[in-house]
Swiss-Prot record:
NCBIfam families: N-Ac-Glu-synth, PRK05279.1. CDD domains: AAK_NAGS-ABP, NAT_SF. Keywords: Acyltransferase, Amino-acid biosynthesis, Arginine biosynthesis, Cytoplasm, Transferase. InterPro entries: AceGlu_kinase-like_sf, Acyl_CoA_acyltransferase, Asp/Glu/Uridylate_kinase, GNAT_dom, NAGS_kin, NH2A_AcTrfase. It comes from Pseudomonas fluorescens (strain Pf0-1). The gene is argA. It is found in: Cytoplasm. This is Amino-acid acetyltransferase.
Amino acid sequence: MPEYVNWLRHASPYINAHRDCTFVVMLPGDGVEHPNFGNIVHDIVLLHSLGVRLVLVHGSRPQIETRLAARGLTPHYHHGMRITDAATLECVIDAVGQLRIAIEARLSMDMASSPMQGSRLRVASGNLVTARPIGVLEGVDYHHTGEVRRVDRKGINRLLDERSIVLLSPLGYSPTGEIFNLACEDVATRAAIDLGADKLLLFGADLGLIDENGKLVRELRPQQVPAHLQRLGSNYQAELLDAAAEACRGGVARSHIVSYAEDGALLTELFTRDGGGTLVAQEQFELVREAAIEDVGGLLDLISPLEEQGILVRRSREVLEREIEQFSVVEREGMIIACAALYQIADSDAGELACLAVNPEYRHGGRGDELLERIETRARAQGLKTLFVLTTRTAHWFRERGFEPSSVERLPAARASLYNYQRNSKIFEKSL
């Protein structure tokens, strides 16, 4: 079977979920200059064709720097913000104007050899962002550098209803007719909040947030962000992370940080279960909970391969439906990726931990320990004093977690009478 067939099948739930949703996508000026920019445009057009309502915000910092250098002007910053005097503002207007036209031209391609053939999409822009001056801070006059006052929510939604891609530039206008240079991250964040967007997608140079060990941080809650900001200092990763967290605090369900250098990063983040960047979300991305009858299908998908290998005892759908209240599960993006069951042994103060299983793709994230802790908590709440487990393959895992070797003779009578000598499982117990 071709690989793309399998990919489409797995992506279909996300295609349905994203249809008619509003996404704000921020692409910095470095991303527009990157060789991968053409692929990003193709992916944006694909999202539009799948029914996503798109607001695209572009940056222009390197383009402004180029124009300042060409005129022999020195850029000035204070606390990471550009000081935009009159001469600098001319460079800003020139850079933003040319960049906006170049992006519109890319989005208008309709060549037979292009993935955009037949798209015929419309790009809309205009005076949709109202700004105000930052003014004087710590004795420093920022001149024409501003901050977003509001975005035209009704106007943008009307354009989105007409199936246009809305393009916002890092310029804002005041009611008195002044022009202000804005940070594209500020524009994107405020647009996402004011529009009540479903997602804010921020492009950066890296795959996402990189931790102190050089590894990608895949998921964060907004309350975890300050610690990372302190570690990062004042680099661009910190700006993106701060924007993502601010959007979530403002009501945006999910913010994503992805790489403009990675071909397909946007699609991977949106149409696969684990994504390819960093997700900042208010709600839990992964949830440990008690199982419900609706989980039976997911449980069967999880445990059937292990049953075929002889690792787990076979359980039919009927058995799972009847015993579903004994199970705890780990759910990730609607998929059951781990489970465990607790059975109270009749006429005793002991219980049995059974059917502990973790999807092979998620076996190194501590989910087995999470489920074991949950089962032990449930057992104590039921007044149980001892927890037994019978296993053929994972004896060492349980030994490392406080289980001691036991025997059939130690099992309560009700469980000992059901022991399968042909399976010859090893027995362990743990005092609670």
